[in-house]
Amino acid sequence: MKQLLASPSLQLVTYPASATAQSAEFASADCVTGLNEIGQISVSNISGDPQDVERIVALKADEQGASWYRIITMYEDQQPDNWRVQAILYA
């Protein structure tokens, strides 16, 4: 099984591994040394809970060809369940 590790304040989310595609995985700050930064993404107006936000970030990272991503900011807007997130992408 593939594990998506969240930031310390979030829960661990587990996804089944795909036989056909390799998805981008979460990388903590202490694990990115030596990885090649390939860009950043920002996503806003995400409805749902923190796990939904992480799934969206993983999908966006996949679209950009990233193997890893690190969420650098994630916060809930003034409206409940409306999130903004920024992440760094790595190859």
From Swiss-Prot:
Belongs to the BhsA/McbA family. It comes from the Bacteria. Gene3D superfamilies: Flavin-binding protein dodecin. This is Uncharacterized protein YjfN. One of its GO terms (molecular function) is endopeptidase activator activity. One of its GO terms (biological process) is response to stress. Its main location: periplasm. InterPro entries: BhsA/McbA_stress_biofilm_assoc (IPR051096), Dodecin-like (IPR025543), YdgH-like_sf (IPR036275), YdgH/BhsA/McbA-like_dom (IPR010854). Residues 1-21 form the signal peptide. Pfam families: YdgH_BhsA-like. It is found in: Periplasm. Keywords: Periplasm, Signal. GO terms for cellular component: periplasmic space.
